[in-house]
Structures are given as structure tokens and as C-alpha cells.
């Protein structure tokens, strides 16, 4: 092989390398930036964000980045544009303080499902003795609960409302014992096994109502409000930049019975496995949550 031929082959190889490199760079440049979805380590939220993430990646080929942090940090990051949306804003009561603080920099994409919060007790606690939050002041009742109100993380919306309930109902001698979702429920489970009473901050939908027989206490002062709605909230301007994603969240729906069943399945295996199986079985329903015209433009 003479030098001229060798030179031509090397030149062709070099140019081919440049072409492939340019093609790869162009493809990389055309890739969509990820939608950053914030979430809190709550059982219902994990199912919701992972179902949404699966659907977005499947139907829109939309990369998704999940960012986990406490709810207060999520609101601040959303308002500052450091994340794009959070699908677990409980209104009108639970997250009212956070929402009121940042609402001018947020977009409400819609309601995903409904819920409820409040103080709850196992059904083994007689209704005749404790039916209402007011009954916690009856003689001898505080001692049966060891003066404890078990709650999840300190400082979240429900924790703040419970502080208000202690003040408004004048629950003298009661203290909030904050830990985590699992810590709160583990202590309640230990108490049940020892035939001890428990008073907990509960919310639904949640798998706790499937595993244990619980009931909410009446709340005549409506500190915890009535029915709650769980909203998907985005940063300002998100729906204009990502209309197809905003449309999906505006049409996202998940029956409460399905959500609670998924949470139980996640405990028995993993959330990823539960979500994958549910999504595969309900793929057609999720397809209906997208706008066909917007989807065709994004592909």
C-alpha cells in the first residue's frame, strides 16, 4: 500500500470520526432537558411521582429527574425555579401556610386526588370515651395516651395544625412526639401489641388504614378542615414551556382504592415493582391522560 493510499484512508477515517462526533453532539444538543419533579418521602407521594415519571418517559420520551426533600424546602425550590413541579400540595388546610407564602410564583396544574388529615385512634379505643378531639380533655384520658400525640416529621403542615389544635382545644399536658412516618407507625404498632392506647396524626389515603383499624376523631373546631385536595403545583411559566406535561398533570387521576392498594404492595415488595405492574395493567388509561396533538409535536 503506497503512502498516498494510506494518507487517503487516514483522512477518510478522520473525517468520519468528525462526522460521527458532530452527529453525536447534535443528538445530545437536541435531547430534552429533564423535568425536575420534587417529592417528599411519603408513601402516597412516592407512588404518584413514580407513576407520573413512568408515563412521561413512556409517552413523551421526556426525561425526568426526581428530587427528594422536606416539603418546606420543596416549596422554596419551586418558587425559586430550582425544581419544576411538586405533585403533593395538600389544600386548603395542610399546606396553606406554604402556599400562601409562595403562591404568586406558582401555577396550579390541577387536583390529582382527594384526602383527609386529622387526629386518629385505633378502633379499640371506645367511641364512648373518645369520639372527638374535645374528649381528650376528659378526666383520665390523657394518662391513657401517656400524654403523647404521635406525629411524623416536625414542622410539616399537619404538625403545625396540631400545634394549633393543642392551643385551641386547650389540650393541657399533651406533647407532640415527632419522628418520621415509619417511626410514628412503629410506635403505634408496639402500643397495640401491648394493649396500650395511641393518638396519632393520620392522613389518607395511606396504607395505615389498610393495615390497622383506625378512625378519625371528630374536629368540631375544624382545625384540620374537611376534605383535602392534593394538587400538582408548578413554578411560574412551566405550563407555557411544557404544555404537554402540564396537560398530563391536569388530567392525571388515580382512584383512592388503587392508590392505597399500591402502597400496600410497595410495602410487601418495592414501590418500583408495584408501579411497574400497575402501569403495565393500566397503560391505555394513562395514554388517555395525554393530549394527542401535543404528544405528536414532542416526538
Where does each model-flagged region fall?
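Immediate post-signal peptide segment of exported/extracytoplasmic ligand-binding proteins
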Residues: 27-37, 138-146, 285-299
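Short, well-ordered beta-strand elements
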Residues: 31-44, 62-67, 146-150, 249
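Short helix-initiation/N-cap motifs at beta->coil->alpha
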Residues: 42-43, 64-77, 176-187
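An extracytoplasmic/periplasmic, membrane-proximal ligand-sensing/linker region
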Residues: 46, 161-193, 206, 227-229, ...
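Ligand-binding cleft/hinge of the Venus flytrap
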Residues: 52-61, 135, 140-176, 280
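A ligand-binding cleft/hinge motif common to bilobed small-molecule-binding domains
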Residues: 87-101, 190-215
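A conserved helix-loop-strand patch within extracytoplasmic ligand-binding domains
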Residues: 104-155
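A bilobed periplasmic-binding-protein/Venus flytrap-type ligand-binding module shared by bacterial periplasmic
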Residues: 117-127, 229-242
